[in-house]
Amino acid sequence: MSYTQAFLRNFLGTSPNWYKITIVLFLIINPIIFFFISPFIAGWLLVAEFILTLAMALKCYPLQPGGLLALEAVAIGMTHPEHVKAEIIANFEVILLLIFMVAGIYFMKRLLLFVFTKLLLSIRSKMVLSLAFCLSAAFLSAFLDALTVVAVIISVGMGFYGVYHKVASGNNFNDSTDITKDDKIGENKDTLEQFRAFLRSLMMHSCVGTALGGVMTMVGEPQNLIIAEQAKWAFGEFFLRMLPVTLPVLICGLVTCFLVEKFGVFGYGAKLPRKVWGILAKFDRNNQQKMSQQDRLKLFVQALIGIWLVVGLAFHLAAVGIIGLTVIILATSFCGVTSEHAIGKAFQESLPFTALLVVFFSVVAVIIDQHLFAPIIQFVLAASEHTQLALFYIFNGLLSAISDNVFVATVYINETKAALEAGLIAQPQYELLAVAINTGTNLPSVATPNGQAAFLFLLTSSLAPLIRLSYGRMVYMALPYTIVLSCIGLLAVEYILPGATNVLIQIGLLKPM
């Protein structure tokens, strides 16, 4: 093997060769266009390239190719290190949220696992169970990180799939078997396929639930906190500002959940086979019998910490990330987790995305320095105030469906804040636009795994291939939710939001600026 071949193999690892070559071409072309053609065109090309790296997340995590593009952008002068640093400091609370809150919830997984297991085994109606999973995921995602909620539900699904697969293969609960191979299933194959379809539908309902709940509060999604910081909204005000849009969307989302299960469309409707339920119930009883006093006390402690988390966030007793740090300290102290290695595992989930977020901010700095979004913002602001809301929602929604919604929200809220400071829009209109940006980035982004981190997390999990959940199938199953959430969100932003906000101000729940 030559050094050239070795270099190509090392560069971006197992990514497709065409993708590696494409990234190298981008790195060659960008400086040429920046210096000899137009910095504006080079800036837009960088944004398009960065969106491509996000869309290719299944082939290669965007941190590496996106990071290389951002590094080059800083090196050739498209932005400056000081501006990147300023963007990071301005959004430091989001970084704290990702580092500490996600890690804190990791230590509450046992409680969440217990809750979802009980839901799965105690509710026999598939429609009620689907609504319960969707609502539970929505409620938890309003206070916790959506990735962690999905991770817990994946753990439940993975555990139950493994239990049934072992028994169907002729083994016992505790036997070590390869659950990726079906060669020993035999006559239970049809039951296994039905169980896979059942788990697929529950996973999708849960993921959509995280989007329904995540849009409602300032801690539900990372971009929410960015918007809340720019608009100077506390937890309660953010919730009330979003309510005219998020409440109708939540209701219609739950109705959609009920209808797709009732009529068995878009891949939904599969029920839990009775044989599988019997095996899972027996497995759960065995686990309950093995549970010690120490284990029960840990669940109780985690429940108390959960109450503290909700109270701390609701009354904004500290920065979100700091509350997450208190969760880590309390959960590890009272549950006996004292090993540095055990604590370190909690941070594995969030730190890659935290690093990627810093790369986002580098691209945002380029967008600001090169005035890339100025024509779009000017076009939107030239419209009437009533039309501006719909246009912001639509532009955010389209971009969020193919790109990461944190990136999209950061760009748009920064540009809108600049328009406010330049006197192009008034404060009340700015606040309505902030709601349109938040809902526009959160709701239509359920269309593809590229937009919602929780969807991407499920797609890249070890459970997805086991239950035959591919990219195409996920998009297809998300389609009814995409249509309903996007359309209801748009109608609410255009026709309900302005009037409802005025009513909330008049009755004293919101303060006029």
Swiss-Prot record:
Keywords tagged on the record: Antiport, Cell inner membrane, Cell membrane, Ion transport, Membrane, Sodium, Sodium transport, Transmembrane, Transmembrane helix, Transport
GO molecular function terms noted in the UniProt entry: sodium:proton antiporter activity
Gene Ontology CC: plasma membrane
Transmembrane spans: 21-41, 88-108, 119-139, 143-163, 208-228, 247-267, 303-323, 357-377, 389-409, 447-467, 477-497
Subcellular location, principal: membrane
Bilayer topology: Multi-pass membrane protein
Cell location: Cell inner membrane
Catalytic reactions on record: 2 Na(+)(in) + 3 H(+)(out) = 2 Na(+)(out) + 3 H(+)(in)
Taxonomic superkingdom: Bacteria
Pfam families per the UniProt record, alphabetical: NhaB
Annotated InterPro entries: Na+/H+_antiporter_NhaB
Function of the molecule: Na(+)/H(+) antiporter that extrudes sodium in exchange for external protons.
PANTHER family in the cross-refs: NA(+)_H(+) ANTIPORTER NHAB (PTHR43302:SF1), TRANSPORTER ARSB-RELATED (PTHR43302)
Family: Belongs to the NhaB Na(+)/H(+) (TC 2.A.34) antiporter family.
Record's protein name: Na(+)/H(+) antiporter NhaB
Organism: Pasteurella multocida (strain Pm70)
